[in-house]
UniProtKB/Swiss-Prot annotation:
CDD domains: SH3_MIA3 (cd11893). The modification Phosphoserine is found at S226, S229, S873, S1428, S1663, S1675, S1703, S1724, S1738, S1742, S1890, S1904. Plays a role in the transport of cargos that are too large to fit into COPII-coated vesicles and require specific mechanisms to be incorporated into membrane-bound carriers and exported from the endoplasmic reticulum. This protein is required for collagen VII (COL7A1) secretion by loading COL7A1 into transport carriers. It may participate in cargo loading of COL7A1 at endoplasmic reticulum exit sites by binding to COPII coat subunits Sec23/24 and guiding SH3-bound COL7A1 into a growing carrier. Residues 154-259, 313-621, 657-908, 1036-1059, 1085-1118, 1416-1443, 1639-1905 are annotated as: Disordered. Residues 1776-1806 have a biased composition (Pro residues). Residues 1748-1905 are annotated as: Proline-rich domain (PRD). The chain crosses the membrane at residues 1174-1194. Residues 1-22 form the signal peptide. The gene is MIA3. The lineage of its organism: Eukaryota, Metazoa, Chordata, Craniata, Vertebrata. Gene3D superfamilies: SH3 Domains. Disulfide bonds: none annotated. Residues 467-527, 1211-1393, 1484-1636 form a coiled coil. This is Transport and Golgi organization protein 1 homolog.
Length: 1905
């Protein structure tokens, strides 16, 4: 940070002064610089890897564009120039950029080579364009203009900003919001940037003390603006958004200047900016395509938290700068957004560079989520055009809302803030934002007057989620803007937001903010970074942000190194102050609760930051969780439906998608809000008020228990409970912003907890008031519905309920928020309601849980299932916790809906929710990850792609329906390929447009990898659509209809989404009521709100999920869950049987209904989480099983008993017996005749089969012959063609050769002349050459001799030199020895002399001393005797002493002299050492001289050698020249030879021509022969076909006769059996009557009451085999009316008597299927006109022939006599039978009557097939199931076949696509050996057919179309 700041600071400091002198220097020709510094000479090696500190957009294509956090690779640097420019690459783009805009992360090399530049270095690297007029870097980067106009513009900007701030909301919203910010900003930004550059220098110190972030921000932005902004300023002037962005940067720069004025202001402003970043929506965000504008947060976003004392104090200072700061808040976006908010972004840029880098992803999400960036900026990215227009529409609507809100403002003092017009910019930004604006509008006028931020705070309260992020943004803005207004607003805002919290909480937060703010100044950077990060995180997982918010409040702040904590505190505290109003009071309706919760959420954050609020928050959350666990799911699911809708919206807004999504939402809202947004707002307010009342009643308990709720929610407050759900939205956005700031997450957690409690309490109806509130909410919702048409009435209700609450709780903002969500969710909100609820439900529940609980999820959401749903809510919480951190889990569990919803759906759903995930069922169901969805949305127009995907889906559906079953896949593949290319083309175009757009916007949003990933996503989506259709509709044909209806949203969802769309507001209002007890009730007004969204979606998810169909509802549900569910659904067909699907569906439906019913029960009657300690599930299952078993038992025992009253008299019986006897006799005769006929017909059939086999074999042989002849013919034709081509080429070659020959002849003649000339020259040359050779030999001999002599001399020289060296060495050694000996000798002599002298002196001294001693003794003796001086010897004593003294002196002198001598000797030694050194150096020099002389001599010798070599080389050159001439002559000879060879080749070619002509003639003859052969073959083929046809006709006739005989026999058998039975009965009765003569009164109709004759064998599945001509279905010979089947068709096999052959006559008869029962032809029913062509072909000829040939077709014989009619009788052109099918056809009837459609069978879950359903010899599973419904049986009905021979029909199955066995063209029972085999015991396996039959099957199958 410091380095980056320093770079920016010095760049700004030094840039301007250097500009003037530098400009002329920077234009050395067409170059930026004369030299460049590289790591190597080619400048191709990397020097540095850096990270972008800011966004940069170059003035032209020579510069590379990048965004903050992008990785930049530096290859070289330009030398000189005031703005140092480097060249590098970002992704695949290469260009120049200012050095100071990147931070070096890694240095690859330290070496720098200065290389001159080339003009080609300064052209466009993309296209090479070099037509540039300006090569002055300073001019291009706009330094001069920025610098010159900085002061004036900055002042203007300040003034304009002040004016804008001061302007009323309308003016500011309308005029300033968009155009004004843009114009002044573009100009002002330049001036401000320049001023800031100068001021930044001054402020650099203050910035250091303050968050250097400001200085950095100023510098970064100033620099950035200086670089980028200046280039952009022109664009900004054109682009209001850009100008707004510039204005933002300008205002931020102004804020930097104000930083000089007050660092606190800047810090607060930056904090506000940070808060803004976190704030999902920007009330005042100006709508524009500019990225910066997107990032701008509206002033309204400033929270009442600004009211905090700290803000209040700072507010005064900021009041001075408030204009600028207001400008900043309005236009600035938070760091998360791109850190374009100059001041704040600067802080965040550097401190939050990490954030932005890490949050860059978030930045896209976060920065845009703030709503402004997203609203404005992201809109350009994703839907800049449409969304912008939509946003403008939303603005208009918002304006309408604002006007209505303004009127409301008159009613509500809070409205003034919204009037400040700041809400309108936000309104422009987002309808939801507009709703927020409306909410802000509802903010008290005093607040709005004092500070639009207060309104923003309230507005943020309404936004809830938005508030959480913007709260920080607002806090920042508030810090800046509200420093003035914060005093008033802090009072009002704190009073308003603190109504619930109580002023003390606000004060605490204010104090905390002060302290934190003071800390934040220093910590702001980190805090801002952390906050923005937290905001990102918070926005992403709002659930996390809840818990994480609490954690982040305490922990993230701590993480912020205390800076963030402080900043978080300040933000929280402002947020806390505003947070109650803004963060958790985003549900302004919650304001009381939120303020209570705000104290929880806002104050808690304050407490967390200042106190240990995290613990309190956790406790509160736990309480909330407990309450919510009971009710959170309902609450979340009910109110959260809206809240979640809003949450997703908010989260989306929070996410970068928020802008675009919000814009889309605005669009949808504006479109859908036909009513003025006032009415919608009022309706939503009313709904939210009532919903809040409901919640608040519940929340009052939980909140009051927490002690956070100072005020108990009024009924109006309860009305706002839906807005509390908005808090859930806030939780969602908190989750998003949780990533941005855990602090906000804490607040959101509190909010979410509050929301869950409120919705929970409302849903639980814990209090009678809550229930009443629910009813009120329902009434409100109904009223709102009415108000949708007459919103004013509801508006009055909303104001009544919400107005007071708004004043107290800031619920009016909540209302607006509710309105915003409701408005946004009128259409989007509703969809979002479903989506959020589904998301919650799905997130709460696992995919399985979704199935069950999604049905229940909405009831839970509505709170109907609350109590039983306590566990579900817990599960939801757990599920949410899974998505959220352990910390976030608390919040997630508290707000499981919020958590889970924001979590998974948050990713896909949130982006989509503003877009309406329901509007994007396909895309939303595909994306699990919000980031991927956001990324997807960033590059593409999602709505357009969704439309294309839906078109593709519809095309696939129609193709699937229209195409024949066997051809479905091919048709689908064609459609798929066509749409794939179309969609990919469109997607690439969108991507290119988006990339260019991003470049224009200076936003390098995408890397190449990201673009590639997005395109991969598009392709995956295409495959997803294709796969969905193939799996859904094929695997589950019965359910496929539902999926088609349901579409992507599921069958229920299609119908329900409209309801949800119609009632999103009501949905918000009456979450509890919204949950319909039954999906059918979704249409009810109450259910419309929650029920439609919640219940409808749950049933939808259930229905969709159960059938295994992918339900787009999964998208509304957690994205993860949705995708899991989707995957599970797609996989279900394979793994789940239809029965299981049906059971699951019924189970989920029952579970849902029970939940809805239980939810409606009074609270005291609702069941608990368990049943006396046992889980409900097993208890219910056992109870249901008991009931079912009892019912079955009762039915089997009691109801089965039938009264058997015999109504037949003896006479009747006797008559019947007689008749029966007669009939029996007749039948016996008939049977015998039929048996004979059958035998005869079997013989005929066998004969015909044999004949057919013979004929088919012959036909095959002929075919083989024909094929071989055709092949030979083709080969000959090819050879003939090749020969012709060769002939033509040879002819052409011959012509060319002739020309060459003529030319060659001419050249030969010329060459001959030349040769003659050359020959003479050559002779001369040879002579000269010979002479040269002789001279060369002489020279060589001389050279050898000289060389030998030279070698001998060298050897001698070397020997002599070696001898010299040896002698010199020995001489030196000896001389050294002599010297050493002499020295030692001298030393010894000197030492001896010294010693002698010393000895002499010492002896003298000793003798003298002895004398002295003697004399002293004598003197002592003589003292007494004589005093005379004379001694004995006559000497005087005095003289003696003198002598002694003299001697002593002498001795002293001797010692002195000796010391002097020693000194001299030492000097002498030193001199000797020097002498030795000089001697050694001399020797060394002499040695060197010798070496040099030797080197010189060697070089001279080498020189002579080289000269000799040079001479020899010159001679060689001469010789080579001569050789070259000789070779030329040889080549000329070769040329002549080649000419002769050419002539020979030409002759050969002429001969080849003749041969080719002959070959052509032969080819013609062959062709004639081939044609003749073909004619003969055709004739023979026709004759054979005719024979085959006649045989087949005969065979079919025989088969018909046999079947008729069989049928007659079977009927007779039945009748005989019946008669036997009757006989037995009669005999018994007769015996009884004889024994007991009892008169039985005859009862009329007795015969009819008896069992009808059993005619089972005549059923379709009877014993009749397939027609010999048809390889397929066996059916009775119903001529043209298939339904006219025998009565026995409905009998089971058990009811059929055995045939005389010893086997049951046929398999279990199938019920008439849909085709027969409904009268509609089934796809495979031949009788219905769908006779399969494959069937036809197989029946028209022998299987082998038909299948192999596929060409033989027989003429139709009119309507087929039976369903399995032979091909010959069916029209040849009839529709083909469907191909392989893995699922049964839709069954409409069962054996006992109509039955429900069975669930789809998985690919491996086909129902068991009857014997007839398999081709002979083909085991089950090897062939496709027939489509004919008659060929499918429900599982479990497999008949048992007794052992024995098969009936004639039982050997053949409806294998219409399979060939008959090898027996012959007529498919008849296989050989007797095969017939002897017992039939399979089940229908799953056909009886084994003969081997021939099985062998024929495989080729037939292969060849069947």
């Amino acid at each position: 940070m410091a380095a980056a700041q320093g770079l920016l600071f010095w760049l700004l400091l030094l840039g301007p002064p250097c500009r003037v002198p530098g400009q002329p220097e920077q234009d050395p020709g067409r170059r930026f610089s004369q030299f460049k510094l590289c790591a190597d000479e080619e400048c191709c090696m990397l020097m540095y890897r850096g990270e972008a500190l800011e966004d940069f957009t170059g003035p032209d294509c020579r510069f590379v564009n990048f965004k903050k956090g992008d990785t930049v690779y530096v290859y070289y640097k330009l030398a000189g120039g005031s703005p140092e420019v480097w060249a590098g690459s970002v992704g695949h783009t290469f260009g120049y950029f200012p050095k100071d805009l990147i931070q070096v992360v890694h240095e690859y090399t330290q070496e720098e080579l200065q290389v001159p530049t080339d003009e080609t270095d300064f052209v466009c690297f993309d296209g090479g364009r070099d037509d540039f007029d300006n090569y002055n870097v300073e001019d291009l980067l706009g330094f001069l203009e920025l610098y010159d106009s900085a002061t004036e513009d900055s002042e203007k900007v300040k003034e304009k900003t002040a004016q804008r701030v001061e302007e009323p909301p309308e003016a500011s919203n309308e005029s300033d919001a968009e155009p004004e910010p843009g114009e002044p900003n573009s100009e002002e930004s330049e001036s401000v940037l320049s001023e800031n550059t100068a001021e930044l220098r001054e402020r650099s110190e203050a910035q250091k003390s303050h968050p250097q972030v400001n200085s950095q921000t100023g510098h970064a932005q100033g620099e950035r603006t200086s670089f980028e902004s200046f280039g952009e300023m022109l664009q900004d002037k054109l682009k209001v958004p850009d100008s707004e962005n510039n204005k933002t940067s300008n205002s931020s720069q102004v804020s930097h200047e104000q930083e000089k004025i007050d660092a606190y202001k800047l810090l607060k402003t930056e904090m506000t900016l940070d808060l803004k970043t976190k704030f999902g929506s920007t009330a005042d965000a100006l709508v524009s395509d500019d990225e910066t504008t997107r990032l701008v947060t509206s002033l309204e976003d400033d929270f009442v938290e600004d009211l905090d004392p700290e803000y209040y104090t700072v507010g005064k200072e900021e009041e001075e700068n408030k204009e600028d700061f207001d400008e900043l808040p309005l236009l600035t976006f938070t760091d998360g957004e791109d850190t374009k908010s100059p001041g704040h972004s600067g802080i965040e840029k550097h401190p939050t560079e990490k954030e932005q880098n890490s949050n860059k992803e978030h930045k896209v999400e976060e920065t845009q989520p703030p709503g402004i960036k997203k609203g404005d900026k992201e809109i350009p990215k994703h839907r800049e055009d449409t969304v912008f227009s939509d946003v403008m529409e939303g603005e208009e609507n918002t304006d309408t809302d604002l006007e209505s809100s303004d009127s409301k403002e008159e009613d509500d003092p809070l409205v003034m803030d919204s009037r400040l017009g700041k809400p309108r910019p936000e309104d422009h930004t987002d309808p939801e934002k507009a709703a927020d604006h409306l909410v802000n509008v509802e903010v008290p006028k005093a607040d709005s007057d004092d500070d639009p931020e207060v309104g923003a705070g309230l507005h943020m309260k309404d936004k809830g989620r938005k508030v959480e992020e913007p709260r920080r943004d607002w806090v920042q803005h508030e810090v800046g803007l509200e420093d003035e207004t914060q005093e008033d607003q802090a009072v009002q805002g704190s009073s308003q937001s603190g109504h619930l919290r109580s002023s003390p909480a606000a004060e605490k937060s204010t104090e905390t903010l002060k302290s934190a703010f003071a800390n934040q100044e220093n910590d702001l950077k980190g805090a801002a970074v952390h906050i923005s990060k937290e905001m990102l995180h918070e926005e992403k997982p709002s659930g996390r942000s809840l818990e994480g918010a609490s954690k982040s409040d305490s922990v993230p702040q701590a993480k912020a190194a205390g800076n963030q904590g402080e900043e978080g505190k300040t933000e929280r505290e402002p947020v806390g102050v505003a947070a109650p109003s803004g963060d958790h009071q985003p549900n302004a309706s919650k304001d009381s609760v939120d303020e209570v919760d705000g104290s929880i959420s806002g104050p808690k954050p304050h407490v967390l930051s200042g106190e240990h609020p995290s613990a309190e928050l956790i406790k509160d959350r736990l309480l909330k969780l407990q309450n919510q666990t009971r009710f959170s799911s309902p609450d979340d699911m009910g109110l959260p439906g809206d809240l979640e809708k809003k949450r997703p919206i908010l989260e989306r807004k929070l996410s970068w998608q928020q802008g675009g999504v919000a814009a889309a939402v605005n669009k949808q809202v504006s479109e859908k809000r036909e009513l003025p947004e006032e009415e919608v707002t009022r309706v939503t307010k009313d709904a939210s008020d009532e919903g809040q009342e409901v919640r608040k009643t519940g929340q009052t308990d939980s909140i009051e228990g927490r002690g956070f709720r100072p005020k108990e929610p009024n009924p109006e407050d309860e009305d706002y409970s839906p807005e509390e759900l908005l808090e859930d939205e806030n939780a969602v956005s908190a989750k998003q912003s949780k990533e941005r700031s855990p602090e906000i997450q804490d607040k959101r957690l509190d909010v979410d907890l509050q929301n869950p409690e409120k919705p929970v309490s409302g849903a639980i109806k814990t209090d009678p008031e809550t229930e009443k509130n629910k009813e009120e909410t329902r009434h409100v919702s109904e009223n709102e519905r009415k108000n949708e048409t007459a919103g004013k009435a509801v508006d009055s209700l909303g104001r009544d309920a919400g107005g007071p609450v708004v004043e107290k709780e800031g619920s009016s903002p909540v209302h607006q928020k509710v309105q915003r969500p409701s408005e946004g969710s009128d259409v989007p909100g509703k969809k979002q309601n479903q989506t959020p609820e589904l998301g919650e439900a799905s997130q709460k529940k696992d995919p399985d849980y979704l199935k069950e609980d999604n049905h229940e999820g909405h009831p839970k959401t509505s709170g109907l299932m609350e109590k039983p749903g306590v566990e579900p809510s817990k599960e939801d919480d757990e599920h949410a916790e899974k998505f959220v951190d352990p910390g976030s889990r608390g919040s997630a569990s508290e707000d499981p809906d919020d958590d889970p919803f924001p979590w998974a759906p948050h990713a896909p759903v949130q982006p989509e929710e503003s877009v309406h995930l329901e509007d994007l069922p396909i895309i939303s169901s595909f994306f699990k990850d919000q980031q991927s969805l956001q990324r997807f949305q960033k590059y593409f127009d999602i709505h357009k792609l969704e439309a294309m995907f839906q078109d593709m889906s519809s095309k696939l559906k129609s193709a699937q329906r229209e195409s024949l079953p066997y051809n479905v896949e091919k048709v689908l593949d064609k459609v798929f390929r066509a749409w794939e290319s179309h969609i990919l083309t469109e997607a690439e175009n969108m991507l290119d447009a988006r990339v260019t757009e991003n470049r224009d916007l200076e936003t390098k949003d995408s890397s190449v990898f990201e673009e590639a990933a997005v395109l991969d996503d598009v392709q995956d989506l295409i495959y997803f659509v294709r796969y969905k259709h193939s799996t859904v509709e094929e695997t589950a044909p019965p359910a496929a209809a539902q999926p088609v209806e349901g579409g992507w949203d599921g069958p229920a969802e299609d119908t329900q989404p409209p309801l949800e769309e119609n009632f999103p507001q009501e949905h918000m209002e009456v979450p509890l009521m919204q949950i319909p007890k039954e999906p059918g009730h979704l249409a009810q007004p109450v259910t419309r709100d929650m029920g439609t969204s919640g219940v409808a979606q749950k049933p939808q998810t259930e229905e969709d999920g159960d059938p295994g169909i992918i339900t787009p509802q999964g998208t509304p549900v957690d994205a993860d869950d949705a995708q899991k569910q989707l995957a599970a659904n797609t996989e279900e067909p394979a793994s789940v049987t239809p029965l299981e699907n049906a059971i699951a569906f019924i189970y989920s439906l029952v579970f849902h209904l029970t939940k809805t019913l239980l939810a409606t029960l009074p609270d005291d009657v609702q069941p608990g989480p368990d049943f006396y300690g046992l889980p409900w599930k097993p208890v219910l299952i056992t109870a249901s099983l008991g009931i079912v078993s009892f019912a079955v038992f009762f039915w089997r025992t009691v109801l089965a008993v039938k009264s058997r009253v015999y109504q037949v008299t003896e006479q009747q019986i006797s008559e019947k017996l007689k008749n029966i006897m007669k009939e029996n006799a007749e039948l016996v005769q008939k049977l015998s005749s039929y048996e004979q006929k059958i035998k005869e017909s079997k013989k005929h059939v066998q004969e015909t089969k044999k004949q057919n086999m013979i004929l088919s074999d012959e036909a095959i042989k002929f075919k083989d012959k024909i094929k071989s002849l055709e092949e030979t013919n083709e080969i000959l034709g090819d050879t003939a063609k090749s020969l012709r081509a060769m002939l033509e080429s040879e002819r052409e070659q011959n012509a060319k050769n002739q020309d060459l020959i003529s030319e060659n002849k001419k050249s030969i003649e010329k060459l001959k002349d030349v040769i003659s000339v050359n020959a003479s020259e050559f002779s001369e040359v040879q002579i000269a050459l010979n002479e040269a050779k002789l001279s060369e030999e002489k020279v060589k001999s001389e050279c050898h001799r000289v060389q030998e002599e030279n070698a001998r001399l060298k050897k001698k020289k070397e020997q002599l030199q070696q001898e010299i060296k040896d002698w010199s060495k020995s001489h030196a050694e000896l001389s050294e020895q002599i010297r050493s000996f002499e020295k030692s000798q001298k030393d010894l002599e000197v030492a001896l002399t010294h010693k002698d002298d010393n000895i002499n002196a010492l002896t003298n001294c000793i003798t003298q001393l002895n004398r002295l001693d003697c004399e002293s003794e004598s003197e002592d003796q003589n003292k007494g005797g004589s005093e005379s001086d004379e001694l004995a010897n006559g000497e005087v004593g005095g003289d003696r002493s003198e002598k002694v003294k003299n001697q002593i002196k002498q001795m002293m002198d001797v010692s002195r002299t000796q010391t002097a001598i020693s000194v001299v000797e030492e000097d002498l030694k030193l001199l000797q050492c020097k002498l030795r050194a000089s001697m050694s150096t001399k020797c060394n020099l002499e040695d060197q001289i010798k070496k040099l002389e030797e080197d010189r001599s060697s070089l001279q010798s080498a020189k002579t050698v080289l000269e000799d070599e040079c001479k020899t080389l010159r001679q060689k050159v001469e010789i080579l020249n001569e050789l070259y001439q000789q070779k030329e002559m040889a080549l000329q000879k070769k040329l002549s030879q080649e000419e002769y060879e050419r002539q020979e080749r030409e002759q050969r070619l002429s001969a080849a021509d003749e041969k080719a002509v002959l070959a052509a003639e032969e080819v013609k003859t062959y062709k004639r022969r081939i044609e003749e052969m073909e004619d003969e073959l055709q004739k023979t083929e026709r004759s054979f076909k005719n024979q085959i046809a006649t045989h087949e006709k005969k065979a079919h006739d025989n088969w018909l006769k046999a079947r008729a005989a069989e049928r007659a026999i079977a009927e007779e058998k039945r009748e005989a059996a019946n008669l036997r039975h009757k006989l037995l009965e009669l005999t018994q009765k007769m015996a009884m009557m004889q024994e007991e003569p009892v008169i039985v009164k005859p009862m009329p109709g007795r015969p009819n009451t008896q069992n009808p004759p059993r005619r089972g064998p005549l059923s379709q599945n009877g014993s009749f085999g397939p027609s010999p001509v048809s390889g397929g279905e066996c059916s009775p010979p119903l001529t043209a009316d298939p339904p006219a089947r025998p009565l026995s068709a409905t009998l089971n096999r058990r009811e059929m008597p055995r045939s005389e052959f010893g086997s049951v006559d046929g398999p279990l008869p199938r019920p008439r299927w849909a085709s027969e029962a409904s009268g509609k032809p089934s796809a495979s029913d031949p009788e219905s006109g769908a006779a399969p062509t494959v069937n036809s072909s197989s029946r028209s000829s022998s299987p082998s022939k038909v299948m192999d040939e596929g060409k033989v077709s027989m003429a139709a014989k009119g309507p087929p006599p039976f369903p399995g009619t032979p091909l010959m009788s069916s029209p040849v052109g009839g529709p083909l039978l469907p191909p392989i099918r893995y699922g049964p056809p839709p069954q409409l009837c069962g054996p006992f009557g109509p039955r429900p459609l069975p669930p789809p069978f998985g690919p491996g879950m086909r129902p068991p097939l009857g014997l007839r359903e398999y081709a002979p010899g083909v085991p089950p599973g090897k062939r496709d199931l027939p489509l004919d419904p008659r060929e499918f049986l429900p599982p479990g009905h497999a008949p048992f076949r007794p052992l024995g021979s098969l009936g004639p029909r039982e050997y053949f199955f409806p294998g219409t696509r399979l060939p008959p066995p090898n027996h012959g063209p007529q498919d008849y029972p296989p050989s007797s050996a095969a017939r002897d085999l017992p039939p399979s015991g089940s229908r799953d396996e056909p009886p084994p057919a003969s081997q021939g039959a099985s062998q024929d099957c495989s080729p037939a199958l292969k060849q069947s179309p």
